[in-house]
């Protein structure tokens, strides 16, 4: 079977000119297909998740604490907006780890960052990073959860300095914001990042979680943060993953035990209420 971009067998052994012509034709076809896809699915306009907390979880939360909401206020100067893995490798069309719905959350992420920054809070961008240290210290993941081909492509995509490792250009990153390397899914486990130390230096006790993927890095970071005694808000429409089912499952798990789960406008209202 011919694979994409491979010269068919009847072209092999032909003159270089004929083979090159075939390759050029295939490239033009791919470019036309890409333009058609982008016209139908413009970057930054992917659909938002249609998912929410399970009714059973809402009922249990109501019995435990009176409702899904956990906190009735926040103090912006003690709060950090943690923006997780919104990098080209997760955001760009056709990228290895593309999460189309992650493009749709960027306006909400920027709104939260702007409001918190203006109110005196901290904005942190975490970058999923695969470098020599990550590979050396986390062999269980790289050797058992990734096949050889996928592992090689992920290393290439998220190596420091690679295009995929860079933050998505539509994010409104300010000069005072922090950009932190993250070598595990969760940002607080040993060997992942120096996030906890940086937050403690700034007197941060509350986190707002945004980013991708909802059920992997956002989930892992939020769970560990709560168990390290941070107050955690998990934002329904500024986190994204590949399917509504995965997103909804994460919201339910977070709301059950770990986080105050609410939407962008609700957390913006909490920030505004402090002024």
What do the predicted segments below correspond to?
Residues 89, 131, 241:
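Active-site loop signature of alpha/beta-hydrolase-fold enzymes
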Residues 121-128, 134, 235:
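Short beta-strand segments at enzyme active-site cores
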Residues 83, 124-125, 179:
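Structural recognition of the beta-strand scaffold that forms the well-ordered cores
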Residues 77, 95-116, 121-125:
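A short alpha/beta connector and helix-capping loop motif
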Residues 2-3, 11-80, 114, 118-119, ...:
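Active-site-adjacent betaalpha module
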Residues 80-90:
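Acidic-leg catalytic submotif of subtilisin-like serine proteases
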């Amino acid at each position: 079977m011919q694979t994409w971009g491979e010269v068919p067998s009847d072209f092999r052994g032909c003159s270089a000119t004929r083979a090159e012509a075939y390759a050029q034709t295939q490239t033009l076809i791919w470019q036309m297909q890409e333009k058609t896809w982008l016209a139908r699915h413009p970057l930054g306009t992917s659909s938002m998740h249609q998912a929410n907390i399970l009714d059973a979880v809402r009922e249990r939360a109501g019995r435990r604490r009176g409702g899904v909401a956990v906190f009735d206020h926040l103090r912006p100067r003690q709060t950090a907006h943690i923006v997780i893995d919104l990098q080209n490798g997760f955001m760009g069309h056709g990228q290895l780890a593309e999460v189309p719905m992650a493009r749709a959350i960027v306006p909400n992420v920027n709104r939260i960052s702007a409001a918190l920054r203006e109110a005196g809070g901290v904005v942190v961008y975490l970058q999923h990073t695969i470098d020599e240290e990550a590979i050396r210290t986390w062999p269980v993941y790289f050797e058992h959860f990734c096949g050889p081909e996928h592992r090689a492509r992920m290393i290439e995509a998220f190596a420091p300095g690679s295009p995929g490792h860079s933050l998505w250009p539509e994010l409104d990153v300010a000069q005072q914001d922090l950009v932190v390397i993250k070598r595990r899914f969760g940002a607080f486990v040993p060997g992942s990042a120096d996030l906890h130390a940086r937050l403690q230096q700034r007197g941060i006790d509350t986190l707002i979680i945004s980013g991708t993927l909802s059920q992997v890095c956002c989930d892992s970071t939020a769970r560990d943060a709560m168990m390290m005694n941070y107050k955690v808000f998990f934002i329904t429409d500024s986190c994204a993953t590949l399917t509504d089912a995965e997103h909804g499952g994460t919201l339910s798990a977070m709301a059950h035990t770990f986080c105050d789960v609410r939407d962008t406008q609700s957390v913006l209202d909490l920030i505004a209420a402090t002024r």
